[in-house]
Design a protein with these regions (language model features):
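Conserved SDR Rossmann-fold cofactor-binding beta-strand/turn motif
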Residues: 196-206, 246, 259-261
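Short C-terminal tail/terminal secondary-structure segment
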Residues: 243, 254-269
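Catalytic loop of short-chain dehydrogenase/reductase
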Residues: 28-37, 107-145, 150-192, 204-206, ...
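Short-chain dehydrogenase/reductase
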Residues: 4-125, 212
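Aromatic pocket-lining residues of Rossmann-like dinucleotide-binding sites
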Residues: 43, 190, 245
């Protein structure tokens, strides 16, 4: 009986204000269904002070409203394809008292390049996917790490298509592979400054971005049928893993890709 009580106590403490006193920057919030928003919600729940970015006027109102609902301290524009916006990001963060966590949830490829065979990927389409989905992580880490004087955590989101061939993922899978390699090199560069860099490989989740992948519903069905847990992962489960990695509980983890996919990635034939 005493053992059960101790376990409950630990579980209670685990989910109690794990990010209190920390400031977190979340890039990539697009709408209420985005994984970035789920992570921002979880960070707010755990006591983090939030900074959110949006890309372009089309998303400004939506992200500002979502930021207000979360009590975000700042909501500002950052287009990661523009060097002037990245320079402005550095300036904005410099005015903050501290920065403890960064979530990079940004990826894009032309729908045509996702749908066509990889061998037919255009040069421009390849470079676009790499620039937005992989290089932006390097640029954001450079801008943010200059303010992370007390150490911290930088997170990004990836997918199984980085190491396995996923139909209709194509050029994005290659971009995610580059992103995961970038995580390892960034972890090596920033580790001496006590800045941890990790990626979360989330299972398929119904987001607006996922609708751009042909036959995405079939991917969900396949995972549900074959994952050890016989279901798909939820945005909240991905967000809770992000909380762990951003908190002091994850202080010994860096340079890694952690899966939140109901175990699907372990399965063979």
């Amino acid at each position: 009986m005493r053992l059960v009580q101790t376990t409950r106590s630990v579980q209670c403490g685990f989910m109690s204000q794990l990010l209190e006193g920390k400031t977190a920057l979340v890039l990539g919030v697009a709408n209420r269904w985005s994984l970035a928003y789920a992570i921002a919600q979880a960070f707010q729940r755990e006591g983090a002070r939030l900074l959110l970015t949006f890309q372009g006027e089309r998303l400004q109102k939506t992200v500002e409203e979502l930021g207000a609902s979360l009590g975000a301290a700042r909501v500002f524009e950052c287009d990661v394809t523009r060097d002037e916006d990245l320079a402005r990001l550095t300036e904005t963060l410099a005015s903050e008292e501290r920065l403890d966590a960064v979530v990079h949830s940004i990826a894009f490829a032309n729908q045509a390049d996702l749908a066509r065979p990889f061998v037919e990927t255009s040069r421009d389409g390849y470079l676009l996917a790499q620039n937005i989905s992989a290089y932006s992580m390097v640029a954001v880490a450079r801008a943010a790490s200059s303010k992370m004087t007390n150490g911290g955590a930088i997170l990004t989101l990836t997918y199984l298509g980085s190491t396995r061939v996923i139909h209709n993922y194509n050029v994005m899978g290659v971009a995610k592979a580059a992103l995961e390699a970038s995580v390892r090199y960034l972890a090596a560069d920033l580790g001496p400054r006590n800045i941890r860099v990790n990626a979360i490989s989330a299972g398929p989740v119904k987001t607006a971005a996922a609708r751009g992948i042909k036959d995405f519903s079939k991917v969900l069905e396949t995972v549900e049928a074959h994952a050890p847990m016989r279901r798909n992962v939820t945005p909240g489960e991905v967000a809770d893993l992000a909380v762990f990695l951003a908190s002091d509980l994850g202080r010994g983890v860096t340079g890694d890709v952690l899966f939140a996919d109901a175990g699907y990635h372990i399965m063979g034939l």
